[in-house]
Amino acid sequence: MLVQRGFSYITEETHHPASKHASAAWERTYNTFSMRQIFEYTFEGRSPSSRWWCAPKSGKIQDPYRRIILYDSIEEAEADFARHLVHSRRALESAEVLILTLGLTEIWEDTADQWIICLPAGPYVNEGGDMSRYRFRVSRYDENLDNLEQIHRIMAAHNPGCHIIVTVSPVHLWATFRLDADVISASCNSKSTLRAVADEFTSRHENVHYFPAFEMATIYRPMLGQSIFAEGRENFHVNQETVEHIMEAFFARYVDEDNAAK
């Protein structure tokens, strides 16, 4: 809808399948740890001790930090990631507005170096790869707030004029790894924790703004008796009418009648 209104967004690595949902080949991220790691490897050269997974049977090389990106060899993976670093830096340094959508607090952590893998899935796991060095846990308020603060610190050093818009995803969990809570309770915990984090983060910085997409989808529209879920998506993703309602509110808040940013 931004493009339909005459706006553009940064598109690096347009050839790369992992850039379909982002301005560079970051793939989708589901937690603030994965977000923070993007900024740290882009600007600070940080790298996990176990950079690649090798599937035991197929030999496919998997990037566990960018969802499910697969290669035929380590050399191919390393070359692609080196190119990605250039594009990632260029995208973040040139951005005028950065939108961060907070999703989950459930994470899978490498016990060796505390890096967070994006998803415990893909050929490596399916083919019997060793997941013993990774542990599941629920991240908490202070950790998530610190992740956003570190992102702000890095952006302030490399692109201080950039504004950051924070939202919370209205897409709830459809499954949980927790043994102490059902999926509805786990989802409520994730969203309420991240909503509180977003509120505190926004209050600390003049260039950080909160946009209430979560509240519009999960509270306001149900109060009006309007459905928010797309048919055939297990009451999981929001429907097109909800998306349009949210985007109209977004334009009303941030864009004037001449399509100029407010």
Region spans (language model):
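Extracellular glycan-modifying ectodomains
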Residues: 1-262
